[in-house]
Amino acid sequence: DKVITFLGRITMQKGPEYFVEAAHKVLQHTDGIRFVMAGNGDMMDKMIDLVARKRIADRFHFTGFLRGRQVYEMLRSSDVYVMPSVSEPFGISPLEAMQCGVPSIISKQSGCAEILRYAIKTDYWDVDAMADAMHALVSYPTLHEHLKQKGLEEVNNIVWSKAGLRLRAIYDRLV
């Protein structure tokens, strides 16, 4: 089975219900996919209930809170990472996923959407687009491999010193 993962706090800010809704749509048309919700938070019970009501509990796994090495083990065992955040000043987890060679789907509302070129971006509320992106990444190996390779190159080139130099150049042009 392919594994599609949500990893983060299970809170309203992170948009876990959109992940579940998109997963439900994918599972209506596609077999051989498992979904993982890794983390904990005040919406955990609500998400477990939603998964049960959607009748997809047999394809869903809740890990609870992960730390340190467990996070990277989870990412490395994933085929796709999804960050459907409603509000996210930056969001470093897609970079961690991409560094592990895992293509990412992120919300356009996250800060990292402004800098990542090789992640698929959807509006957090557009569960149809999110489901389409999930389906595409597990169904089209060429697309998956392209985003895996380009994403890895992209995150390996994100260096704080380069970002600082670019920021300084912008500042110098303005002054």
Locate the predicted segments by residue:
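Conserved donor-binding/catalytic core segment of Leloir-type glycosyltransferases
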Residues: D1-K14, V20-A23, V36
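A charged, aromatic-enriched C-terminal amphipathic alpha-helix characteristic of glycosyltransferases
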Residues: T142-D172
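Conserved acidic donor-binding segment of nucleotide-sugar-dependent glycosyltransferases
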Residues: A119-D128, A136-P141
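Short alpha-helical donor nucleotide-sugar binding micro-motif in glycosyltransferases
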Residues: F65-L66, E73-S78
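Short glycine/serine-rich donor-binding loops of glycosyltransferases
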Residues: G91-P94, C112
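Short hydrophobic beta-strand element within catalytic cores of glycosyltransferases
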Residues: P103-I106
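Nucleotide-activated donor-binding/catalytic signature segment of Leloir-type glycosyltransferases, i.e.
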Residues: I48-L66
